[in-house]
Amino acid sequence: MDIFDIIGPVMVGPSSSHTAGAVRIGYISQKLMGEQIKEANILLYGSFLDTGKGHGTNKAIVAGLLGMQPDDMRIPHSMEIAEKKGIKVTFGKSTLKEAHPNSAQIILTGISGKQLEVVGESLGGSRINIAQIDGITTNFSGDYPTLVVHNQDQPGHVSEVTSMLAHKSVNIASMQLYRSNRGGNAVMVLECDQEIPREGIESVSYTH
């Protein structure tokens, strides 16, 4: 079971959708990755593809992948910073079907060889939605302390995670379960009212 925890408008312009939202998509993607990024293939869709370069969408996503927030003054220089860090960044056109017009498909490779694919949507006003993780449909914003669990669809995983949160006095605000198919890959998203202690996350991760 892989465990990821995330996140939870001041911005460097010009657009809340194309810049602030794009930074947040990149930021959540690198949190989900959980290790240093070696390569990032960023595929843009719709308005992101058509007008994103002029609005700095490409630099904004890379800034988020570097751990920057929307108000970070280094955003315009994110490409140079990524190059200095040895991160290979490429851009292309996404082949997503019927996606939100401000969508980015981000394919990451970490230093261990781990790969992750995230599809994020920028909804305006710096609001975003993470629509897919590794091809599995999801729906969360990262506005709350959020625990994302990537596991096999088998009995016991849900109760293990919820028991850990109860033991740490963390209240679950919402919980969503997604799976590719019965017994296949699954994603559990738990938005919480409190920050999730690191030792709680590790206690679940180390049992698998």
Q: Each PLM stretch: what is its role?
A:
Residues 124, 153-172:
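Short amphipathic alpha-helix segments
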Residues 149-151, 189-194:
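Short beta-strand-to-loop capping motifs
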Residues 207-208:
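Conserved small/polar residues in nucleotide/adenosyl-binding loops
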Residues 7-12, 20, 25-148, 154-155:
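Regulatory modules associated with amino-acid/nitrogen control
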Residues 90-91, 171-177:
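A short linear hydrophobic-aromatic micro-motif
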Residues 131, 166-167, 174, 195-202:
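Long, contiguous binding/interaction regions
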Residues 179-187:
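Short proline/glycine- and acidic-rich turn/helix-capping motifs at secondary-structure junctions
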